[in-house]
């Protein structure tokens, strides 16, 4: 079992990053010449429980560690994440990163403060995969869907 302090830390990073990207929090914007970071998830649709997907990021901060995880919008402005399957990756010198992540059709969701939300069902909730650094910065989350 993962200690609750680790759950709080990891969920907070991914949740804050996802919320900031979706306009729910204000973040520092880099100069206009810098491209916004992007993320891709392959495959992202027609998934089965336990599918291992490839998560890639570009335009990231070189040398920065990112947590990668699955989250869902469970209520207006409320994001619950699955810390049990989180992974980490560090962006290379070009600002690119790639890792694998196991995604779940349903999972025990935790809020950014570590509060247990309850069971999240990705066949009814808007689930996504996201990347976030320690400050909560990262590309927009990528929507995923299950069979």
UniProtKB/Swiss-Prot annotation:
Record's protein name: Neocarzinostatin
NCBIfam families hit by this protein: chromo_anti
Coiled-coil regions, chain positions: none
Species assigned in the record: Streptomyces carzinostaticus
Disulphide linkage map: 71-81, 122-127
Domain of life: Bacteria
Pfam families: Neocarzinostat
Transmembrane parts of this sequence: none
Sequence similarity: Belongs to the neocarzinostatin family.
Described purpose of this protein according to its UniProt entry: NCS has antibiotic activity (for Gram-positive bacteria) and antitumor activity (for certain mouse tumors). NCS binds non-covalently to a chromophore which is the cytotoxic and mutagenic component of the antibiotic. The chromophore binds to DNA as a weak intercalator and causes single- and double-strand breaks.
Keyword DNA-binding: yes
